[in-house]
Curated annotation (Swiss-Prot):
Required for formate dehydrogenase (FDH) activity. Acts as a sulfur carrier protein that transfers sulfur from IscS to the molybdenum cofactor prior to its insertion into FDH. The active site is at 121 (cysteine persulfide intermediate). Pfam families: FdhD-NarQ. InterPro entries: Cytidine_deaminase-like, FdhD. Belongs to the FdhD family. This is Sulfur carrier protein FdhD. GO terms for biological process: Mo-molybdopterin cofactor biosynthetic process. It comes from the Bacteria. It is found in: Cytoplasm. Mo-bis(molybdopterin guanine dinucleotide) binds at residues 258-263. One of its GO terms (molecular function) is sulfur carrier activity.
Length: 274
């Protein structure tokens, strides 16, 4: 399997997922200048030779994305269910070829859907309403987080957004320990993809105690993906939706929105929060 490592800040010359284009600024319309833009390409996840989903994504940390998506969608239950991940760049996008165990591939074929996604859209292509909600085993109550450490984590979030710092165009997802230290994270133009990348990285790291921190709002699917991978606490910089709160309540996930310096709104299961 491709090696998966936590993202860290790099110099602009080393950054993948962004490139420079000529642009015109309002105050200098006659003088083209170069500016950084985030890359967005179609990424096809292909399981044992069968294309399962196409998502628009930033072309970095794609092995982590493949693993995290497979876990958060319930296609696999552990990284050991994937034997190999290989990237195949093409003219129109990137194929991520994933070799599944025969048992997991048989299960996937039963529920396979063809889904062409817009940026981070996780519902596109689902054929029936009942397919939106996946059964999630209620989470245990083994985690705790002191909000005094939240500001520390927020101050570090841009460390995993080198493309975002250049372009202002990416979402971030990070794993923070109970002391507020950012252990690693990912970025992407799509918030769901950024989260899947993080969940893929976490699956290969000894990160148990802590929480997920995302730079976006908390939709139902962000909650569902987090819970599917066993994380008990989700901090979102923006608000949560009503459906996200309902799903979090049902699966015992602690959901916190408006996670900003000096501020936090706890929606569900506050017993984990100090």
């Amino acid at each position: 399997m491709s090696q998966i490592k936590p993202s860290r800040l790099s110099s602009s010359a080393e950054i993948r997922g962004a490139r420079q284009l000529d642009v015109l600024q309002r105050h200098k319309l006659a003088e083209p200048q170069q500016d950084w833009l985030a890359e967005e390409v179609p990424v096809a996840l292909v399981y044992n030779g069968i294309s399962h989903v196409v998502m628009m994504a930033t072309p970095k940390d794609l092995a982590a994305f493949a693993l995290g998506f497979s876990l958060s969608e319930g296609i696999i239950s552990s990284p050991q269910d994937i034997y190999a991940i290989e990237m195949t760049p093409g003219c129109n996008g990137i194929e991520v070829n994933i070799e599944l165990s025969s048992r997991r591939f048989a299960g996937l074929k039963e529920r396979r859907r063809a889904m062409a996604g817009r940026t981070g859209c996780g519902v596109c292509g689902i054929e029936q309403l009942d397919d939106i909600f996946r059964p999630i085993t209620p989470l245990p109550f083994t985690q705790a987080f002191n909000l005094e450490h939240l500001d520390t984590a927020l101050a570090q979030l841009k460390q995993v957004q080198p493309v975002g710092q250049l372009t202002g165009c990416t979402h971030a997802a990070a794993w923070i320990n109970p002391e507020g230290e950012l252990l690693g994270g990912c970025e992407d133009v799509g918030r769901h993809v950024a989260l899947d990348k993080l969940l893929g990285i976490r699956a290969k790291q000894p990160w148990q105690q802590g929480a997920v921190l995302v730079s976006s709002r908390a939709s139902y699917e962000m909650v569902q993906k987090t819970a599917m991978c066993g994380a008990e606490i989700l901090f979102a910089v923006s608000a949560a939706t009503t459906l996200a709160v309902e799903v979090a309540e049902r699966c015992n996930l602690t959901l916190v929105g408006f996670s900003k310096p000096g501020r936090a709104t706890v929606y569900t299961h506050p017993q984990r929060i100090k």
